[in-house]
């Protein structure tokens, strides 16, 4: 799901749907941006596998705009995931 494909959910909604991240990189208020797989972002929520260090999912934000939820594949590439409906 991307912000362009439908109305962008807010941070509280995404938090409720995917839960608290294991780690966070950057901040939506951070002026510096990063680029991953062609997406510019300044905050990344990181979700690691339970009991491990392997990253299984990330949520990307650019400022307060939701960019999407992505499954991190074994080769390091991203696969878009739909936002869970809880």
Language-model regions, residue ranges each:
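Residues within mature, well-folded domains
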Residues: 1-86
């Amino acid at each position: 799901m991307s912000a362009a494909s439908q109305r962008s959910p807010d941070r509280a909604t995404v938090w409720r749907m995917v839960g608290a991240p294991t780690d966070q990189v950057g901040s939506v208020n951070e002026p510096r941006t990063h680029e991953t797989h062609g997406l510019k972002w300044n905050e990344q929520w990181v979700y690691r596998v339970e009991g491990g260090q392997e990253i299984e999912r990330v949520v990307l934000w650019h400022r307060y705009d939701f960019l999407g939820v992505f499954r991190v594949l074994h080769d390091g590439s991203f696969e878009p995931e739909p936002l869970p409906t809880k």
